[in-house]
Design a protein with these regions (language model features):
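A structural micro-motif recognizing beta-strand termini
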Residues: 17-19, 30
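A residue-level detector for short acidic-glycine micro-motifs
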Residues: 5, 16, 41-43
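Short alpha-helix capping/helix-loop boundary micro-motifs
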Residues: 23-27
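C-terminal structural segments of small proteins and small subunits
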Residues: 12, 42-70
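Short, surface-exposed acidic/glycine-rich loop or hinge patches that mediate macromolecular interfaces
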Residues: 19-22, 44
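Intrinsically disordered, low-complexity, charged/polar segments
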Residues: 2-5, 66
Length: 70
């Protein structure tokens, strides 16, 4: 299951991130988005979704939402 399939306002644990880009993986890690970390989808948008990680909110696109397994 990935973030695009997640229910709104339900907390999940990140299982894996498969972006295929080491630089993007490092950026996500710096935001606190890595395996074992809780993540909550705040809302689904046409082009992506808004997520909450470590009390911060981020807008991510659909491609990235599909790369984050929960």
């Amino acid at each position: 299951m990935n973030l695009k399939d997640a229910n709104i306002l339900e907390e999940y644990i990140i299982k894996d991130i498969e972006t295929g880009d080491d630089e993007l993986d490092a950026f996500l890690f710096s935001l606190g988005c890595y395996s074992g970390e809780p993540i909550t989808v705040i809302s689904h948008l046409k082009g992506g979704c808004v997520v909450s990680i470590k009390d911060a909110r981020y807008n991510i696109d659909n491609d990235l939402a599909e790369a984050i397994s929960i």
